[in-house]
Amino acid sequence: MLLDETRVNSSTLVKVTIAIPTYNRREKLRRLLNSIRASTFRNYEVVVVDDASSDGTREMIMEEFQDVVYIRHESPTLVAKSRNDAIEASRGDYIFFVDDDNVVEPTTVARLVDFMEKNEDVGTAAPVTCWYSNPRKVMYAGAVFSPFMRRTVFLYAGTDCRELEGKVIEVDTFANSYMFRREAVERAGPIPWRRVPWNGEDGYLQYKIKRLGYRNVTLGSARVYHDADPEEGARRYNDMRLYYALRAKIFFHQDLDPPLRRTGFYISLPVYTAYYMWVARRGGRGVAPVLRGLLDGIMGREGLQYV
C-alpha cells in the first residue's frame, strides 16, 4: 500500500474527510473530484483509496489533484478494505464516503455537517441519491429492513427529488454516499473486511452504529447524483456479485440481528437463494456462485473468493 504520509500526519485541523474508494473509473473519479472542488464547504480533505486500478488513475491524481491524499493497494482487496484504509488515514470530525461514480451537489457537504453538528445523536447521515441520467428522480433515499424476512427495502425510489426537500428520513442503512460521525465509527470499530469484503460492507458498519444507539438518517435537502444504468437490471450481477450478495447478507444478519430477527432471516433464506438463482439465470449466468455463497455463508467461510 502506498500512502502520502506527509498529508496524513499534518496537524492542520480538518472538519470533514471526504473518502473515495475507487477501481478503474478514472474519468468518473475526475468528474467527482471536480464536483467536490465546487463545494460551498471548504474545511475538508480528500482521501482516495485505489484498489489497484490499471487505467491511469494514479497518474491522473498526481497530475491534476495534488492536494488529495492518495492510497494505492498493490493488488485488489475489494472495497471494505478500502473503506477501512480511508478511515484510518482520515483526520476529519466527520467522514463523508462517496462512491467514485457520483457527482456531489455544491451544498451537500455543508448541509450534512450542519445537520450533524445540531443532532449529536445521529451517527450516520446521508444525502438523497438521485439518478445522474434523470436528476429529478430519486434512486434511493436510504433503506430499512423488513421485520421478518429482513429484506432490504429502498425508500422513495422514483419520487421527485424535490419532494424530499426538508425531510429527515429515519433509516437502517444507506448505499453509495453517507457521512459518519468519527466518534460513532471509533466505537463501532472497522469493517470485518475478510468477512464482508464487498456488497453490503458499508451497511454492515452503518447498522452496527445504529445498534450502538445512534440514529441513521437521510437528509432530504442534500443530494448526490449516481451515474448508474437504470436499465441494467440483472446484467449487473456477475459471478462475483452473485456470490457476495448472498454470503454477505448471511454474515450481516448473523452478526448484527437480535435472535428473533435472525431466526426470521434464516427461515427466509431459501427465498433469497431462489431469488438470486433467478437473477443469475435472467442475466445468462450459472447458479454455482449463488450456491457457493450460500454454503460459505452457512459454514462461516471468510476471505476473498472473487476479486
Q: Where do the PLM segments sit?
A:
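Conserved donor NDP-sugar-binding/catalytic core segment of glycosyltransferases
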Residues: 107-147
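A conserved acidic beta->alpha catalytic loop
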Residues: 35, 50-59, 75
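Glycine-rich, basic loop-to-helix element that forms the pyrophosphate-binding segment
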Residues: 73-90
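Non-catalytic, C-terminal membrane-associated alpha-helical segments of glycosyltransferases
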Residues: 240-245, 258-307
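A short, conserved alpha-helix in the catalytic core of glycosyltransferases
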Residues: 172-180, 184-189, 194-222
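Short, flexible, basic/aromatic active-site loop/helix in glycosyltransferases
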Residues: 145-171
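Short, acidic, metal-binding catalytic loop of nucleotide-sugar glycosyltransferases
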Residues: 34-43
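Short aromatic/hydrophobic "clamp" motif used to bind/position activated sugar donors
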Residues: 95
